[in-house]
Swiss-Prot record:
Name of the featured protein: Methionine--tRNA ligase
UniProt subcellular location: Cytoplasm
Enzyme class of the recorded protein, top EC level: ligase
UniProt xrefs under CDD domains: Anticodon_Ia_Met, MetRS_core, tRNA_bind_EcMetRS_like
Subunit: Homodimer.
Cofactor note: Binds 1 zinc ion per subunit.
Signal peptide positions on this chain: none
Length: 688
């Protein structure tokens, strides 16, 4: 059989935080599938990357005092401990700000443009008047225009999975400031997903039964025609896709369009190809030749929350830019806890991957448990601590690991570590185990690891029944039964080897330890057909795995201790200590507000005309319009910084600063309070 050539990816994690258990579940699922493919002799390139672009990262980097590139690099530096910890073996890990991704994204765009799939339109776009910037989709929230779910993002609804323009939202608000955004016009670039060519292709591609699971295809089908929303309204057809964003933005510039950048969801999936190209470049291999091979298969493992981008936009981008489309999009559900409850760290139902490892919990316990749950369908899986303990302790250790421990000691001590001949009853048992190789490999192929585990555990039951029937511990006590003891124990070791091969994609570390114990090279599925044989030398058995304890599970799900809120006056720390000389540099004066008026074009500022006793007035702008009307301030005394350098503003020159008090968290503690001296103070008096 000719070896298959396969390219595999997982969804790109957004580079603004650590991995969560959902990431780890997906990576374990994909890693297991990749290992199963390699155990069939197939050539697989398995790549991942960080999704590095977008306004959220740009804003987070600014808050952290870093460049976006350094912010992403710091996040990426923490990935290895997770991947190594759970035995997840990517061939390459890159990020979407790589030179390869810039090059490929821009070329795909140009190819789509040449094919007539890109057009420009002047659109109205939301702008935050307080932050003075166009708002990215994820920083606009409001009511979904399709199903009317509240607090949905500006690009897609997490309830009904609809994709729409931010301007379609009902009652939108800025997630940055809470302000109601205003509409401003801007020229944007659109991918014409509604083009009849795209609709025809996507209809066939998503509904032909080859590329997505049936339940996913059924959901996608709703998006092509008229569909009824939960509130009774209807929506129809595929919409064109806005693929551009305005500066300031951290991303990839659109060719020949200064100040315009690709929307993150255009260049993010291209990151799959870019990470592969980066890998092949390191190896000195030709990326274009690799991708041009008609036998190449392309698989993407993703969560159900990003189906739209991977089953509509991504295949259409590839198809109409002249590239290979995915062989299959493999969609999984979410992980819940305790019979469907959403995970929550504060309630003690969150599963923190690093905490799991820090508690000394075996990563292959989790790999096995997830393997026993994942079935290749787009279904949520539930983590139940009691079920976890039972499956690990009773099944994995009690049924599988203990087979070796019940036989290996006798072989090593009584027969010098050499296997013997297997009699007819043992051969019959081993034949039954070997007969299941095809179905188990097929289960792995279908990503139905639950079936692969279930079938393997049934085989473990047969082997344990054989052990119980033949009682090697009693044979060891009987004179003249050495040959039978060696026969029975050899059968157990041969069976254990077969079972280990079946579980190897899920338990790579255990399989490696078993290979050392059996003194065999790393084995593939086909090798179950060949016995180790009489005379084969094995090593001394070392215990493979400890049992899960209740204490570990209690600690894993222990809610964090309630945070003791530090008393911070006014919501912000007292500033660092200064000297009296430092303070003396600031010239604070009593000022009279001679005139106060609103500033046209600003909702925040008031223009104050101040008498500071200089014989002439000063002009100062102050952001206090939300709390004071001009007539309320006119004639009042206040305090100003008189020696602050004048600042040129959009509305004029500001010649100082009026002092006002406010809480650091103005949303939670609204209010701005202008300082007013006691009666008797006169304009121009200095404050000491």
């Amino acid at each position: 059989m000719t070896a298959r050539k396969i390219f595999v990816t997982t969804a790109l994690p957004y580079a603004n935080g650590n991995f969560h258990i959902g990431h780890i579940m997906e990576y374990i699922q994909a890693d297991t599938w990749v290992r199963a493919q390699r155990m069939q002799g197939n050539a697989v390139n398995f790549v991942g990357a960080d999704d590095a672009h977008g306004a959220p990262i740009m804003i987070a980097a600014e808050k952290a005092g870093k460049t976006p590139q350094q912010f992403v690099a710091d996040i990426a530096a923490g990935r290895k401990q997770y991947l190594d910890g759970f035995h997840i073996a990517f061939d390459n890990w890159s990020n979407t700000d790589s030179p390869e991704n810039h090059e490929l994204s821009q070329q795909i765009y140009l190819d789509l443009k040449a094919a007539g799939f890109i057009e420009t339109r002047t659109i109205e776009q939301f702008f935050d008047p307080e932050k003075n910037m166009f708002l990215p989709d994820r920083f606009i929230k409001g009511e979904c225009p399709r199903c009317h779910a509240k607090d949905q993002y500006g690009d897609n609804c997490e309830v009904c999975s609809s994709v729409y323009a931010p301007t379609d939202l009902i009652n939108p608000y800025s997630a940055l400031s809470g302000a109601k955004p205003v509409l401003k016009t801007s020229e944007h670039f659109f991918f014409k997903l509604s083009d009849p060519r795209a609709v025809e292709f996507l209809t066939e591609w998503t509904q032909n039964g080859q590329h997505v699971q049936p339940e996913v295809a059924a959901k996608i089908k709703e998006w092509f025609g008229t569909r009824t929303n939960p509130d009774g309204t209807t929506s129809e057809g595929l919409d064109d896709w806005d693929i551009s964003r305005d500066a300031p933005y951290f991303g990839i510039e659109i060719p020949d369009a200064p100040g315009k950048y690709f929307y993150v969801w255009l260049d993010a999936p291209v990151g799959y190809l870019a990470s592969l190209k980066n890998l092949l470049n390191k190896r000195g291999e030709d990326y274009d030749a690799y991708m041009a091979d008609p036998q190449l298969e392309q698989y993407h493992f993703i969560g159900k929350d990003i189906i739209t981008f991977h089953t509509l936009f991504w295949p259409a981008m590839l198809k109409f830019s002249g590239r290979k489309t995915p062989t299959k999009i493999c969609v999984h559900g979410f992980m819940t806890v305790n019979n469907g409850e959403k995970m929550s760290k504060s309630r003690g139902t969150g599963l923190d991957p690093l905490k799991y490892l820090a508690l000394g919990m075996n990563p292959e316990w989790l790999r096995y448990y997830l393997g026993a749950k994942l079935n290749g369908k787009n279904e949520d899986i539930d983590f139940n601590p009691e079920d976890f303990m039972a499956r690990v302790n009773s099944d994995l250790i009690g049924k599988y690991v203990n087979i070796a421990s019940r036989a290996a000691g006798f072989i090593f001590k009584r027969f010098g570590g050499k296997l013997g001949e297997v009699s007819a009853d043992g051969q019959a048992l081993l034949a039954q185990l070997r007969e299941q190789a095809g179905p188990i490999v097929a289960a792995y192929e279908a990503r139905d690891t639950a079936r692969a585990v279930r079938e393997t555990m049934l085989l473990c039951d047969r082997v344990n029944s054989y052990v119980d029937a033949n009682k090697p511990w009693e044979l060891a006590k009987q004179e003249g039964m050495e040959a039978r003891l060696q026969d029975v124990c050899t059968t157990c070791i041969e069976a254990f080897r077969i079972l280990t091969i079946y579980l190897k994609p899920i338990l790579p570390q255990v399989a490696a330890e078993v290979a050392r114990f059996l003194i065999v090279p790393p084995e593939q599925f086909a090798e179950v057909a060949q016995p180790l044989g009489a005379g084969h030398q094995i090593g001394q058995y070392q215990h493979l795995m400890q049992r899960v304890t209740q204490e570990q599970l209690d600690a894993l799900f222990e809610p964090p201790a309630p945070a003791v809120e530090k008393v911070i006056p006014g919501g912000e720390e007292i500033a660092p200590t200064i000297t009296i000389d430092d303070f003396a540099k600031v010239d604070l004066r009593i000022a009279k507000i001679v005139k106060c008026e609103a500033v046209e074009g600003s909702t925040k500022l008031l223009r104050l005309t101040l008498d500071v006793g200089e014989g002439q007035t000063r002009n100062v702008f102050s952001g206090i319009a939300s709390m004071y009307k001009p007539k309320d301030l006119q004639g009042k005394l206040t305090v100003m910084v008189a020696n602050l350098a004048p600042r040129k503003m959009k509305f004029g020159l500001s010649e100082g600063m009026v002092l006002a008090a406010s809480h650091a968290d103005e949303k939670a503690h609204p209010g701005i309070f202008v300082l007013e001296p006691f009666p008797g103070a006169q304009p121009g008096m200095r404050i000491h």
